[in-house]
């Protein structure tokens, strides 16, 4: 993506593992972030693996102009889900 890399964040650090509800809660949080026009920071992030240094990850919440978000969830037993959401 180069300079156009989409912002990256994570919610699990703040909500813990909610077992079956995790994916649904993260989808709601992604929609709320879109509604507010922000990308939530990851304040517990101490360092970034050098292999991912080009990704726009931040400890601080920052403004963002987007109407779409990609929510990725993984479950036990190899279950994976990708949900692309758009703000109304």
Task: Label each residue range with its predicted role.
Residues 1-14, 22-76, 86-88:
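Structural signature of cysteine-dependent C-C bond-forming condensing enzymes
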Residues 81-84:
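Short beta-strand scaffold segments in enzyme catalytic cores
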């Amino acid at each position: 993506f180069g300079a156009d890399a989409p912002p990256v964040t994570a919610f699990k650090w703040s909500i813990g593992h909610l077992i079956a509800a995790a994916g649904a809660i993260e989808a709601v949080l992604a929609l709320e972030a879109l509604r507010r026009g922000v990308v939530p920071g990851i304040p517990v992030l101490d360092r970034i693996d050098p292999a991912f240094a080009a990704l726009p990850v931040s400890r601080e919440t920052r403004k963002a102009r987007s109407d779409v978000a990609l929510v990725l969830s993984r479950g036990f037993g190899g279950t994976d889900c990708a949900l692309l959401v758009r703000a109304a």
